[in-house]
Curated annotation (Swiss-Prot):
<comment type="similarity">
    <text>Belongs to the GppA/Ppx family. GppA subfamily.</text>
</comment>
<dbReference type="GO" id="GO:0015949">
    <property type="term" value="P:nucleobase-containing small molecule interconversion"/>
</dbReference>
<keyword id="KW-0378">Hydrolase</keyword>
<comment type="pathway">
    <text>Purine metabolism; ppGpp biosynthesis; ppGpp from GTP: step 2/2.</text>
</comment>
<dbReference type="Pfam" id="PF02541">
    <property type="entry name" value="Ppx-GppA"/>
</dbReference>
<dbReference type="InterPro" id="IPR043129">
    <property type="entry name" value="ATPase_NBD"/>
</dbReference>
<dbReference type="InterPro" id="IPR030673">
    <property type="entry name" value="PyroPPase_GppA_Ppx"/>
</dbReference>
<dbReference type="Pfam" id="PF21447">
    <property type="entry name" value="Ppx-GppA_III"/>
</dbReference>
<dbReference type="GO" id="GO:0008894">
    <property type="term" value="F:guanosine-5'-triphosphate,3'-diphosphate diphosphatase activity"/>
</dbReference>
<dbReference type="GO" id="GO:0015970">
    <property type="term" value="P:guanosine tetraphosphate biosynthetic process"/>
</dbReference>
<dbReference type="GO" id="GO:0015974">
    <property type="term" value="P:guanosine pentaphosphate catabolic process"/>
</dbReference>
<dbReference type="InterPro" id="IPR023709">
    <property type="entry name" value="Guo-5TP_3DP_PyrP"/>
</dbReference>
<dbReference type="InterPro" id="IPR003695">
    <property type="entry name" value="Ppx_GppA_N"/>
</dbReference>
<comment type="function">
    <text>Catalyzes the conversion of pppGpp to ppGpp. Guanosine pentaphosphate (pppGpp) is a cytoplasmic signaling molecule which together with ppGpp controls the 'stringent response', an adaptive process that allows bacteria to respond to amino acid starvation, resulting in the coordinated regulation of numerous cellular activities.</text>
</comment>
<protein>
    <recommendedName>
        <fullName>Guanosine-5'-triphosphate,3'-diphosphate pyrophosphatase</fullName>
        <ecNumber>3.6.1.40</ecNumber>
    </recommendedName>
</protein>
<dbReference type="InterPro" id="IPR050273">
    <property type="entry name" value="GppA/Ppx_hydrolase"/>
</dbReference>
<dbReference type="InterPro" id="IPR048950">
    <property type="entry name" value="Ppx_GppA_C"/>
</dbReference>
Length: 494
């Protein structure tokens, strides 16, 4: 057995897709080894009597035969298979499940909507950064889960019987993307939401997180179109107009929307617009994980950390043998600089967090080689799994690390969309200066400094005589002033 005993698998038999996640436990965190997803569209096989067609069941079994091959290497006690909305509804679910268990060689559990909502919330709590008090929205194929909670604790759980497959069959059956079909789909979704809206609003939230294919598709569209990753009602309405303009489902073309997501995109979009409107949501971001992650973390009995980003940074520092003392030293200098200029530059708290995160990882490129360390660092951060950081935040971190020294590549700072371009430039300047002044790798050799910002001009004041006593330091700072001046960042050092 050996190396397979640390493997865990979670399978989710959803109404639209079947998913399998295989992970390995590594030092209290999970490393993803396999993700397999197949569009089975089980919900589309339900007739008016809620009986599943033989074709739909066969599609499901065929998919499970693929999964079964991968499961043979994993201890049965470390596998969880759950079925959701369609198999809760189907009158002949028993037939499907009996054969599914035979194929997989392990039990299949049909979970209630509330249990599904709880697991989704756990998956989000383990993998998503940001404020503690959250609303989680997951639009599935045949049900939509809405959960409020604080930290690891849920405060209200709802599973509503509407989903992107059932709404597709009901309101877009003619494949027409006209305003009237969207209106009908949204109106119906709002009616389903209305009875639970008050309780959700009563519990309240500081952040709203989406955890489903629809939200993933929106994120992909927004990244492809160079928008920032925050989903707002205004952006949803713009995408709806674009869909209406396309006219028919088979002609739906939106930059960044993949073919496999296109079929259920309009119905998912209508449900999401209804949720935004009914609950008065200002903005939503994509979750780092959901149902499958909830199942895996549940099997591992890992506690939810208050600060997921910190856990992620710690794990990566250990894995790449980063000098943690030096990372902290640079972070301390950068935080000091940030605090001195934040009012003048109107910087937000999240920008400070991201700057400190960049400091914690700035030497990761050395684990590959000293030559081109910034490029190695950017590559690693762009491609590592970083729970707690959104895709846009990862891109910003990679861009900051790419520009931590040497001439500045301004276009890369403008291509990220986690923060406005000007803020990315400002964070980059602070990171570069912090790295320079902590470079002797000793706390007692970091000088006392004041940094003042006046619009784009930075004035750095060093102790009397410091520049004369540190000729190499002076040379490095002169070079830095020159590099910053090339991109019109005025820097004066006294």
């Amino acid at each position: 057995m050996g190396s397979t005993s640390s493997l865990y698998a979670a399978i989710d038999l959803g109404s639209n897709s079947f998913h399998m996640l295989v992970v390995r436990e590594v030092a209290g965190s999970i490393q993803t080894l396999t993700r397999i997803k197949r569009k089975v569209r089980l919900a589309a096989g339900l007739n008016s009597e809620n009986a599943l067609s033989n074709e739909a069941m066969e599609r499901g079994w065929q998919c499970l035969r693929l999964f079964a091959e991968r499961l043979q290497d994993i201890p049965p006690s470390q596998i969880r298979v759950v079925a959701t909305a369609t198999l809760r509804l189907a009158v002949n679910a028993g037939d499907f499940i009996a054969k599914a268990q035979e194929i997989l060689g392990c039990p299949v559990q049909v979970i209630s909507g509330e249990e599904e909502a709880r697991l989704i919330y756990q998956g989000v709590a383990h993998t998503t950064g940001g404020a503690d008090q959250r609303l989680v929205v997951d639009i599935g194929g045949a049900s939509t889960e809405l959960v409020t909670g604080t930290g690891a604790q849920t405060t209200s759980l709802f599973s509503l019987s509407m989903g992107c497959v059932t709404w597709l069959e009901r309101y877009f059956a003619d494949r027409n993307l006209g305003q009237e079909n969207f209106d009908a789909a949204e109106k119906a979704a709002r009616e389903v939401l209305r009875p639970v809206a008050d309780e959700l609003r009563y519990h309240g939230w500081k952040v709203c997180v989406g955890a489903s294919g629809t939200v993933q598709a929106l994120q992909e569209i927004m990244m492809a179109q160079g928008m920032d990753e925050r989903i707002t009602l205004e952006k949803l309405q713009q995408l709806k107009q674009r869909a209406i303009h396309c006219g028919r489902l088979e002609e739906l073309e939106i930059d960044g929307l993949t073919l496999e997501r296109a079929l259920v995109f309009p119905s998912g979009l209508a449900i999401l617009i209804a949720i935004f409107t009914e609950l008065n949501i200002q903005c939503m971001t994509l979750a780092g994980g959901a149902l499958r992650e909830g199942l895996v973390y549940g099997m591992l009995h890992l506690t939810v950390e208050q600060d997921i980003r910190s856990r992620t940074l710690r794990n990566i520092q250990r894995r790449f043998m980063i000098d943690i003392d030096q990372a902290q030293r640079v972070a301390k200098v950068a935080a000091n600089f940030f605090d001195q200029v934040e009012n003048e530059w109107h910087l937000e708290a999240i920008s400070r967090d991201l700057l400190i995160s960049a400091c914690q990882l700035h030497e990761i490129g050395l684990s590959v080689d000293f030559k081109q360390a910034p490029q190695h660092a950017a590559y690693l951060v762009r491609n590592l799994d970083l729970p707690g950081f959104t895709p846009a935040q990862k891109k910003l971190l990679a861009t900051l690390l790419l520009n931590q020294t040497n001439p500045v590549d301004l276009s890369s700072l403008h291509q990220q969309n986690a923060v406005p371009p000007r803020v990315a430039e400002q964070l980059c300047r602070l990171l570069r200066l912090a790295i320079i002044f902590a470079s002797r790798r000793r706390d007692d050799l970091v000088p006392e400094m004041t940094l003042q910002a006046n619009h784009e001009l930075l004035t750095l004041t060093l102790p009397q005589g410091w520049l004369t006593q540190h000729p190499l330091g002076k040379e490095i700072i002169d070079q830095e002033s020159q590099w910053q001046s090339y991109v019109h960042w005025p820097l004066e050092v006294h």
